[in-house]
Amino acid sequence: MSESLARTERLGLVEVFRSLGPSAPTLCEGWRTADLLAHLVLRERKPVAALGILVPSLSARTEQLTLELASDFEANIRLFESGPPSWNPMRYLDALVNGSEMLIHHEDVLRAQPEWKPRVLSAQAQQEARRILRGAAQLMTRGAKVKVRPDPAGALTPANGEVVIRGDEV
C-alpha cells in the first residue's frame, strides 16, 4: 500500500522547509516557516500545551511555547519529519486525521512564495483530499449564505443550485 496523504504531505513540507529556511513567508498571518513548523511540532509533541489553539484562555501559553520552539528550526524539522512520538495516539491515527492539516499547511507555505504554481496531486492524493473535503464540507461552510454539499464528483455545490464551486481541491 502506498503512503497516506498525511505522510506524503508531511515529507513534502519537510522538503520545502529545508529548501526555504526559517524566514520564508507563509499564508498563516504573521508566521514565517519557523513559526508554522513550531506550531506543527507543538501539536504533536506537546498536545496539552497546544490546547491554546482551541481554547482561547490558554492561547497566550501556546503562543509563548510556539515562539520558544521556533528558535531551533533544524531540530524541529527532524522532529516533524519523524511524525508524532510513540506515546501520542496521533502516531497511529496520522493517516486518518492529519491529511488535511498537512495538505493545508503545505499549501500555506507553497502559495506564499512568489514563484508558486499550482501542483498536480496524484490520483490517490486527490481521492483522499476529496474524502476529507466531503467529511468537512458542512463544518467548513456552516456560516455560508448558501447551503453547500459535496456533489458525487467531490466538488462543492449548493443544495439550492444557485452557486457552484468546482475545481481541484488544491
Description of each model-found segment:
Residues 57-71:
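C-terminal end-helix/capping segment
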Residues 1-3, 19-23, 46-60, 75-170:
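Structured surface interface patches that mediate subunit assembly and partner/cofactor docking
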Residues 6-12, 69-81:
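Short, charged, amphipathic alpha-helices and their helix-cap/turn boundaries
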Residues 39-43, 62-66, 131-132:
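Alpha-helix boundary/capping detector
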Residues 1-52:
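An N-terminal domain-cap segment
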Residues 4-9, 28-32, 64, 68, ...:
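Short, contiguous, pocket-lining structural segments
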